[in-house]
């Protein structure tokens, strides 16, 4: 009888730690339905599966990553569950797309930004509203929120029906340089994650937001081959460094030059 109790307790402990390990790989929870009104989903017309995220910054413009560019992009706004459609969901397509570099020649580590002008403005609603551009760069150690419909497992491609959110920290750029040997000495890129691992953006989160104090500070760019690994934080395009370019394009200067 005692042996049975011991075995039962061991089984409970094993299940508990297995669950905690799984939580570390997943690294986040379902976003509150009202906390991501600026989060958009990028699809292609040929596929029903979203391939990237994006960020609504005003009624007519969306930010995403250059690596997310496709020929036939469809942009869904106001979505939470991919299975249950909100009444105020709106769909748009790009009218114009702007890049710091060609979407095919952006460097692996830099210039990963795309600015999309929608074919028609969207209306603010219960589940749709733009996010503020940054007034200052994020401080080292800031707790920021990353979100998206990307895969929630580091070992297999498992996409959730709803966006997941996780809190991560702004880390010193040297941490990412140590993790990625080819990362240049200077870059307009944010390094963000959890040093011990367990929370991270992952496949199909690219182009989505990194929100710090209610402002869009980063665009999900890339990370390690396996998400959420210790000392392998993610890389995020630094929005603050591209503010002049973004504002110039929106103001009508289509020849605006990105920062070097």
Swiss-Prot record:
Any one biological process term the GO annotation gives: proteolysis
SMART domains referenced in this protein's UniProt entry, alphabetically: Tryp_SPc
Record carries keyword Lipid biosynthesis: no
Keyword Protease: yes
Signal peptide feature range: 1-18
EC number(s) stated in the UniProt entry for this protein: 3.4.21.-
Pfam annotation, one family: Trypsin
Highest taxon, organism lineage: Eukaryota
GO molecular function terms attached to this record: serine-type endopeptidase activity; toxin activity
Transmembrane segments: none
Record-level GO cellular component terms: extracellular region; secretory granule
Glycosylation: residue positions: 123-124
Prodomain residues: 19-24
Subcellular location: Secreted
Subunit structure: Monomer.
Function: Snake venom serine protease that may act in the hemostasis system of the prey.
PANTHER family on file: KALLIKREIN-1 (PTHR24271:SF47), KALLIKREIN-RELATED (PTHR24271)
Protein name (Swiss-Prot/TrEMBL): Snake venom serine protease 2
Gene name, Swiss-Prot/TrEMBL: TLF2
């Amino acid at each position: 009888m005692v042996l049975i109790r011991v075995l039962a307790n061991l089984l409970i402990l094993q299940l508990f730690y297995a669950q905690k390990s799984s939580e570390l790989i997943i690294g986040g929870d379902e976003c509150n339905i009202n906390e991501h009104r600026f989060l958009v989903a990028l699809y292609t017309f040929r596929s029903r599966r979203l391939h990237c995220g994006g960020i609504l910054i005003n009624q007519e413009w969306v930010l995403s990553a250059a690596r997310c560019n496709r020929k036939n992009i469809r942009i869904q706004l106001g979505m939470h569950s991919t299975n249950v459609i909100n009444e105020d969901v709106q769909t748009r397509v790009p009218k114009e797309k702007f890049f710091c570099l060609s979407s095919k020649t952006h460097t692996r580590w830099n210039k990963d930004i795309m600015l999309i002008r929608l074919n028609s403005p969207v209306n603010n609603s219960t589940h749709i509203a733009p996010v503020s551009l940054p007034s200052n760069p994020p401080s080292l150690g800031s707790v920021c929120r990353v979100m998206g419909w990307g895969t929630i497992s580091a070992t297999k491609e498992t996409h959730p029906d709803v966006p997941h959110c996780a809190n991560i920290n702004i880390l010193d750029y040297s941490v990412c340089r140590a993790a990625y040997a080819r990362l240049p000495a200077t870059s307009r890129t944010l390094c963000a994650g959890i040093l011990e691992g367990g929370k991270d953006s992952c496949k199909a989160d690219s182009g989505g937001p990194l929100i710090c104090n209610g402002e869009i500070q980063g665009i999900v760019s890339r990370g390690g081959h396996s998400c959420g690994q210790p000392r392998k934080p993610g890389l995020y395009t630094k929005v603050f460094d591209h503010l002049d370019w973004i504002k110039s394009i929106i103001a009508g200067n289509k020849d605006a030059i990105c920062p070097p």
